[in-house]
Amino acid sequence: LYRKSADLGFADAINDLGFLYYQGASGLKRDPQKGIDLFLKAADLRHPQAMYNVAALIDDGVVAGKTPDDAARYLYAALRSGVRDVLAQLSERPNQFKPATRKALQAELAKNRFYSGKIDGSIGQGTQRSMRIAFGETGN
């Protein structure tokens, strides 16, 4: 069912199938590269969780040829999608990303005029506020 939906271009199914291949599942042989390829395909379709997954995989160094700047662009796009889970994950567990990716995210937020603080990789109150504003929340 996932494969059929993924073949029809449904980003949710592509992302879910990517997870199943990346992790391995009952009846499905583990194939991390196929999982990454599917995550990238879903991210290209602007699927927020796929963009977040790709950023995490880049941060872990498993996506060839991608840098912390690439991870930050995926995180920023995921934030801008307006999906609360992405904001919650970034807000509650920012240290799951390495300092270089966190700095690159701050730089991406600054480039898009959401952040004017120090680019230091510390996800403090200023960066948190900037992420909420980029997400679409107003106020503090």
Named regions from a protein language model:
Residues Y2, D7-A11, Q23-A25, L45-P48, ...:
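Short helix-capping/linker turns of helical repeat alpha-solenoids
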Residues P99-A100, A110-N140:
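Short acidic, glycine/serine/threonine-rich helix-capping segments at coil-helix boundaries
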